[in-house]
Each structure stands twice: as structure tokens, then as C-alpha cells.
């Protein structure tokens, strides 16, 4: 199926970052920024399914994660191709119109879902050397039956592993001194990125450990600035998905 130009034109990222440097295998550090852009693209295409606010992000994060972050923890079942429309004899004109409208809506939702997946898949294929995904490629159909989510899972499972050493480096990055002449949002991002990395590595921060990192930043500032920053920085984030 060809990629709908209307879908691609709505993406905030016309292309995504490369999932790895030239000649080097992907890592979590190189995969995460690219997949984050892919998530944003998926979420930008409206959908009435699920909770109706997250677009088609289910295509990149999967069903379980979608239900976790959706309003009301609702699921997003993938649309199925509707069967040919059959109109029983004796059906009223009004009911025929309703049946046709419902069938058209179901067909449009199915086609849109697959068009978005095709567009996202093309982006990740363009951003990744085939060497690292060749095990998913069929000799006859290529990647035609491979979904965007399957590509993402393959890359993370095979190349995005987080080690004890990289977790140690991550905490050091979280504790890098903040330049107080820059916006405080940069400090928030620094700590949030570290928390997300630790969670992805299977070592989410306990409350105690979180506060240790938090006060590492606010206590050296002292004075009124420290008092000002403390309630801002030391707010434990929501769980990451």
C-alpha cells in the first residue's frame, strides 16, 4: 500500500534521526531520540479509537503501553478490514444510508491505520541500515508484513540494551552541575531524561534515591535560590512508559 501524502504532511518530523551512526550498530542512546520522533509523528495523526487524544501512537508504543498512558486506561484494538456490505431485502432507505455510512467509516479507519503504519515504517527503514534488521526481511515480500512496532522491538531488544556501566554513567549525567544562567527547564530535562533512562534499564529510581539526586542540585545553591528551586526540582515525575 502506498503511503498517503496527507498522512506524511501532518508529521512534525518529515524525517527522523538516524537510529545509529554510519558504520556503527545502534545503541539505546542512538535509538531513543529517533523513536521519540517517531512517537510524535504517530501521535500527530488523529484517531477516534482508544481515548481519542493520542492519535495513532499505539503503532509505535504497542497495546500494553498505550493502555497504561491513555485517559481511563482504555485499550486501542487495531481496526479490522470490514466485510463486504450486505443489505438485506426490505431495508428502509434510511437504514441503508446508515449501513453504508458505518461501512465507509470502518473502511476509512482501517485504511488510515495502515497508511500511518506504512508511513512510520518507511521512516524507520530509511533511518536504519538494513544490516541491523535483515532478520525481519522476507525473501519474497521484504518488510511488507513487518509492522513499525516489530521493527522498534527488534532494534531495542537486540541493540538497545542498557548495562550497569551505562546506568552508572547516566547517574553521573543526572548530577552534572546546572548552569544557573540557563533556563531551569534544562535542569528538569536533565533529571527527567536520567529517570527515563534508568527506568528503561530496569532500574527505576526509588523515592529515596530520587531525592538524593534532587537535593544534589538544590542544596549547593543555598540562600533564596535554593529555597526557590527545591519545590520545583524535587517533584517526583510520573512513571515513564
Give residue spans per PLM region:
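Short connector loops/turns at beta-strand edges and beta->alpha or beta->beta junctions
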Residues: 129-133
Amino acid at each position: 500500500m502506498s503511503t498517503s501524502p496527507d498522512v506524511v504532511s501532518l508529521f512534525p518530523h518529515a524525517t527522523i534521526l538516524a537510529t545509529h551512526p554510519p558504520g556503527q550498530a545502534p545503541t539505546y542512546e542512538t535509538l531513543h531520540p529517533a523513536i521519540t520522533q517517531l512517537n510524535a509523528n504517530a501521535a500527530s495523526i488523529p484517531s477516534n479509537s482508544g481515548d481519542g487524544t493520542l492519535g495513532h501512537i499505539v503503532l509505535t508504543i504497542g497495546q500494553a503501553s498505550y493502555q497504561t498512558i491513555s485517559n481511563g486506561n482504555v485499550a486501542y484494538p487495531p481496526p479490522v478490514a470490514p466485510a463486504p456490505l450486505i443489505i438485506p431485502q426490505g431495508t428502509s432507505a434510511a437504514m441503508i444510508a446508515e449501513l453504508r455510512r458505518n461501512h465507509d467509516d470502518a473502511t476509512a479507519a482501517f485504511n488510515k491505520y495502515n497508511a500511518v503504519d506504512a508511513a512510520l515504517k518507511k521512516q524507520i527503514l530509511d533511518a536504519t541500515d538494513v544490516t541491523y534488521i535483515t532478520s525481519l526481511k522476507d525473501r519474497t515480500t521484504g518488510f511488507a508484513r513487518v509492522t513499525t512496532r516489530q521493527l522498534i522491538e527488534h532494534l531495542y531488544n537486540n541493540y538497545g540494551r542498557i548495562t550497569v556501566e551505562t546506568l552508572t554513567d547516566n547517574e553521573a549525567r543526572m548530577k552534572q552541575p546546572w548552569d544557573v544562567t540557563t533556563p531551569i527547564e534544562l535542569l528538569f530535562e536533565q533529571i527527567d531524561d536520567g529517570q527515563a533512562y534508568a527506568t528503561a534499564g530496569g532500574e527505576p529510581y526509588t523515592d529515596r534515591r530520587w531525592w538524593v539526586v534532587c537535593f544534589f542540585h538544590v542544596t549547593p545553591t543555598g540562600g533564596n535560590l535554593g529555597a526557590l528551586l527545591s519545590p520545583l526540582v524535587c517533584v517526583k515525575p510520573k512513571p515513564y512508559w
